[in-house]
């Protein structure tokens, strides 16, 4: 069936007076718990009711991936210095990948050393004013589904990441891929979608165990205000049973997990954190994305968190059309939208830069939040190494570069970071109306309306020098130097506008 037809169900559910600004004494920038709202006023908000924008990156250094070659590690060693470098790019959010396979390697026994590592990363990020989104990550179910030499595959499948071995039931199905399409073909292996079928059927209680593992981690992390929330499951696959049946199971899994995490938060006297939920990416091993029906929960503190790889992996829609489609789906849920993953990986960096600039325009115009894929990717990552472990690059560039030993080389992807590190409002008083920015000259324009006086916060890149301001109904109360730039605290009232420029 053409993919266009398969997307149809998704689509269906679908004057300014210029004044000079004065500068006063700087203020502290304390990180605080955020919440989400649904309905007419949807998105991320702080305790003062200001709309918050999150910009950041995915980070996999605590990941538990399949190893193709023992001499070529699949992840870079964890280093808190990464968070400092992220902060210098203006990032205020990191999507921190973790894996169930390391959290619960033995059934019913949670890896306290791993939980400590996760908590340390949360604390390290907090020192740089970075929010952490905890993401239970998986790709193609887990690292225990990998083709063996005796499988005699025409197209052998790398192992990936996700579930522990004890929760991997494949019915003896083939691990071989349908074709040589690389990453995009990993889910075509019958062993992968049989494993997901067992998960959604709760065979041997493995889905319950996964939910319990989430609750256990939430008890340990709910005390941190910089934990922005929990991403329930990365890119879930559906099984092989009838589509609507499987979609219903996805929704029930989300609902049960949200309830369990809420109980865990209450049990330790912690406030609620935002729940992030995604759309499925396959059914019967084929690229048939679908969404859970909107009635899976009445929880208000949730956000739709899809991934978009239009003009990167799929070309069915333009990246702008894809963004609009996903925004329409978030409207169906009456939630805010957070793009958990997106990226451009063309052989010509100039092509990727052009696409990223277009995405930036679309995102800014929608006051969007996102995390780019990804901070670092070693040559030994399953995305880059061959199945037999013999073919891999000497170096690998994501946003930073690593060598084949997994070490940071000191090189950065300056072309992409120049766009990703563009200035943006971190907290907006009142109702946002218009926002644009130019990563080439640092110019920023923001317009909003408020029925009470308040403060809007802007992060401004230092690349262009000290910023200048033209405001209507606004006054700069503080301009604080922070990592990578400036934090501008602007007192605003009524319908206001802020223009940032450089001389």
Predicted features by range, described:
Residues 18-30:
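Bacterial Sec-dependent N-terminal signal peptides
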Residues 296-297, 305, 348-472, 481-503:
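Aromatic-rich peripheral "rim/lid" segments of glycoside hydrolase catalytic domains that contact
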Residues 1-8:
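Bacterial N-terminal signal peptides that target proteins for export
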Residues 111-118, 319-322, 352-357:
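Charged helix-capping and loop-helix junction motifs
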């Amino acid at each position: 069936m053409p993919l266009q037809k398969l997307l149809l169900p998704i689509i269906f559910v679908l004057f300014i007076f210029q004044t000079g600004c004065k500068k006063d004494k700087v203020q502290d920038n304390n990180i605080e718990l955020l919440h989400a709202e649904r309905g007419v006023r949807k998105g991320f908000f702080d305790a003062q009711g200001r709309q918050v924008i999150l910009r950041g990156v995915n980070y996999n250094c605590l990941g538990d991936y399949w190893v193709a070659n023992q001499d070529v590690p699949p992840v870079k060693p964890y280093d808190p210095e990464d968070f400092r470098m992220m902060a210098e790019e203006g990032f205020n959010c990191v999507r921190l990948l973790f894996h169930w396979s390391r959290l619960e390697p033995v059934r019913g026994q949670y890896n306290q050393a791993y939980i400590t590592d996760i908590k340390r990363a949360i604390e390290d990020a907090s020192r740089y004013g970075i929010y952490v989104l905890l993401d239970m990550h998986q790709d193609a179910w887990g690292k225990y589904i990998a083709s063996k030499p005796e499988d005699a595959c025409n197209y052998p499948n790398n192992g990936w990441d996700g579930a522990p071995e004890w929760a991997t039931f494949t019915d003896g199905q083939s691990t071989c891929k349908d074709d040589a399409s690389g990453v995009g073909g990993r889910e075509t292996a019958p062993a992968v979608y049989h494993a997901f079928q067992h998960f959604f059927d709760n065979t041997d209680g493995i889905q319950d165990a996964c939910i319990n593992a989430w609750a256990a981690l939430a008890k340990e992390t709910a005390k941190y205000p910089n934990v922005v929330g929990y991403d329930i499951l990365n890119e879930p696959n559906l099984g092989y049973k009838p589509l609507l049946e499987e979609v219903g199971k996805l929704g029930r899994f989300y609902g049960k997990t949200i309830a369990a995490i809420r109980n865990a938060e209450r049990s330790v006297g912690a406030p609620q954190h935002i729940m992030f939920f995604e759309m499925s990416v396959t059914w019967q091993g084929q690229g048939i994305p679908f969404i859970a029906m909107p009635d899976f929960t009445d929880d208000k503190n949730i956000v739709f968190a899809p991934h978009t790889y239009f003009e990167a992996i799929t070309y069915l829609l333009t990246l702008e059309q894809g963004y609009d489609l996903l925004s329409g789906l978030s409207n169906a849920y009456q939630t805010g939208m957070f793009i958990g993953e997106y990226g451009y990986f063309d052989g010509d960096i100039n092509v990727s830069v052009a696409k990223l600039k277009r995405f930036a325009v679309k995102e800014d115009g929608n006051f969007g939040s996102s995390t780019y894929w990804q901070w670092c990717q070693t040559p030994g990552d399953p995305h880059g190494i061959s199945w037999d472990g013999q073919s891999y690059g000497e170096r690998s560039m994501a946003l930073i570069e690593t060598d084949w030993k997994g070490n940071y080389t000191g090189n950065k992807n300056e072309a992409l970071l120049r766009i990703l590190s563009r200035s943006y409002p971190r907290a907006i008083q009142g109702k946002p109306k218009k926002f644009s920015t130019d990563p080439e000259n640092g110019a920023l324009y923001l317009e909003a309306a408020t029925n009470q006086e308040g403060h809007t916060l802007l992060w401004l890149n230092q690349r262009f020098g000290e910023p200048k301001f033209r405001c209507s109904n606004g006054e700069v109360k503080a301009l604080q130097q922070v990592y990578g730039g400036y934090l501008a605290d602007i007192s605003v009232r009524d319908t206001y506008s802020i223009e940032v420029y450089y001389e």
